[in-house]
Amino acid sequence: MKIALCSSFVPFVNGGARNIVEWLEIELKRAGHQVERVYLPQVDAPDLLMPQMMAYRWVDLTKLSDRIICFRPPAHLIPHPNKILWFIHHVRVFYDLWDSEYRSFPDDAKHRSFRAALHRVDTSAINEAKKVFTNSKVVSDRLTKYNGIGSELLYPPIAMPERFSSAGFNDEIVYVSRVEHHKRQHLLLQALKYTKSPVKLRFCGKAFNVSYANELRTVVAKHSLNSRVSFDDRWISEEEKIKVLSECLAVAYLPIDEDSYGYPSLEASHSGKPILSTRDSGGVVELVTDGYNGLLVEPTPQSLADAMDRLYLDRAVTMQMGKNATARIKELNISWSHVIDRLLS
């Protein structure tokens, strides 16, 4: 079968939205299909919204592919008689983040009209799909709430999970992610001030917002935490990441209302490490069961500090939660064989 994988991307920004496409391409080719990736750029600037949507609508793959699978918006606008969606999120500033601090434009007549138009167009285009899958219950719930559309949950695996394993438990809680305000690395730093154990933090990831990165370093200096906090202000290699995860105490991932459980959480699970997250972290809560394969706490410094101490001081429980984290993947049937079966059914 000739399959086109259609998605959008933000230039010079790598992350899960690209991984899900590229990793699926590998698995589909392994299954004997012809696969082509189709990308167009997209940014959340309101004045570019409609032109970008039109560009996707004009893409015609009808005679070139037997099926298209669409991921990141507005790729779902591409018309095709055999269109499948693996929908990973909306343009969130016009949906669930409209009333949040992350909307950078005014709530005025102009932008409300953009929002209303986007909702109408999205609903129409999504309804064109033969099947609609999502990467989390969170996203499925948003589709129901905002577009009145039902969907099937299909959790995304990672590439070559057999690369990851546990090599023991050191004193570091590791956070592998882009360094951004909504990923809330600052919460962990604030929590470290209240810990009673000598637990350490390690942040691995690039900061695109320089001011936020500087704020984090200021907190470290102000509270004399230099000996307990390390920053890898870059994208560490896959080999480095595998080693860091294999040796760490636990993995932290606490974004605000995340679209899915996030690849850092899944990589932690394959590495046999418990996940530290918060109850408002969206899709992460679908993967983590508190006290079983990680700890879910309130998004406050003191609650996180208590959890960090627990991970450090009760190593037997920490190790058992790590074993359970690996088992949790099988419990949720997170595998490429399941993904291929559902997307091509």
Which stretches of residues belong to each language-model region?
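Membrane-proximal helix-turn-helix segments that form the acceptor-binding/catalytic region
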Residues: R103, D108-V132, S140
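Nucleotide-activated donor-binding/catalytic signature segment of Leloir-type glycosyltransferases, i.e.
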Residues: N214-W235
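Short alpha-helical segment that forms part of, or immediately flanks, the ligand-binding pocket
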Residues: I242, S265-H270, V285-E286, Y292
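Acidic donor-binding loop of glycosyltransferase active sites
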Residues: L245-S260
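Short hydrophobic beta-strand element within catalytic cores of glycosyltransferases
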Residues: H270, P274-T278
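Conserved acidic donor-binding segment of nucleotide-sugar-dependent glycosyltransferases
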Residues: D290-G291, L295-P301, R310-R315
